[in-house]
Amino acid sequence: VTTTGRKRQMIHQQYEVDDHLHEECGVFGIYDMDGNDVASTIYYGLFALQHRGQESCGIAVSDTSGPKGLVLSHKGMGLCNEVFTPEDLESMKGNIGVGHTRYSTAGSSTRENAQPLVLNYIKGTLGLAHNGNLINTPQLRQELARTGAIFQTTIDSEIIAYMIARARVEQPTVQAAVAEAMKKIKGAYSLVVMSPRKLIGARDPYGFRPL
């Protein structure tokens, strides 16, 4: 086999090895219409999804019958059984919630980058758990920074959360705000978004990421 032939063979082999979808992070969302607490259910859901990410995990919940705008969250570095104790789960009262297990593809592996992200903004509170990557992160980050956004993390999930929060100021519902934000974010992703009263799931237009 000639040198050129070997190079072609190596390139072909490399292509075959990498020509697969690489899916990282696990997202979970639940809304119990009967009003039951969901933290433990989310925990076991994350436990089942833990093969998708072992760096960090977190849960955010809200009680739809409780004070409007209250979202409780707990997250940390490590596996589910390292981050959550039975007492932690018991203290998280709420019948709507989202959860996340992280495998970092963008941003460093730190507690600040653990999800779900919870934002307080003029319209209330927003929780977000996201899997995937955006391809226009630098442009969106610069656009948000020009309007005064202060970033607490290095992950593109925060950009999505900011885009939704900013859209919500002009849109009548959280659902409409998510749809509006999705017009501007580009990439392969899936996400679950919660307000204190609503739970929304979304995927990129091509449905690359599982949900």
Predicted regions and their residues:
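Conserved short alpha-helical segments that host acidic/polar catalytic motifs at enzyme active sites
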Residues: T2-L211
